[in-house]
Amino acid sequence: MVDVVVLVDDLFFQAKIVETARLTGITLAICGTGDAFIATIDRESPKLAIVDLNSRGGALNALERLRASGNQTPLIGYLSHVQTELAESAKAAGCNDVMPRSKFTANLASILSGAKS
């Protein structure tokens, strides 16, 4: 079982998340598409899911489909601080928390640690 499932296609952020997870003892599953993200959440039942809302893997659609299926895994999304419309769309799609990349990066270790088994 993994602790956290992440939808991200930005290699810089992927590397940052993977390294922080390693340092905090969190097991991760990294997904590049919305379909893989949903399938992994359904299979692994993680404590947390993280979404790069700028992912080309269909982030908003994946959030909507996940919530429509009844899945209540806590979801955190991150994006550029100027993308207020995207932030509102993510919240409407079922994202529990949406934050700017800077806040996500600054708090990544504590975010991941909160999902420890």
Predicted regions: what they are:
Residues 94-106:
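Output/docking surface of receiver
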Residues 73-82:
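A short, hydrophobic beta-strand element within the central beta-sheet of small alpha/beta folds
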Residues 82-97:
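Alpha4 helix (beta4-alpha4-beta5 surface) of REC/receiver domains from two-component response regulators
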Residues 51-66:
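Conserved phosphotransfer microenvironments
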Residues 26-33:
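Short hydrophobic/Thr-rich beta-strand motif most characteristic of the beta2 strand and flanking loop
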Residues 2-11:
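Conserved acidic segment of CheY-like receiver
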Residues 33-48:
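Acidic, metal-coordinating helix/loop segments flanking the phosphotransfer/catalytic sites
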Residues 67-72, 93:
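Conserved phosphotransfer cores of two-component systems
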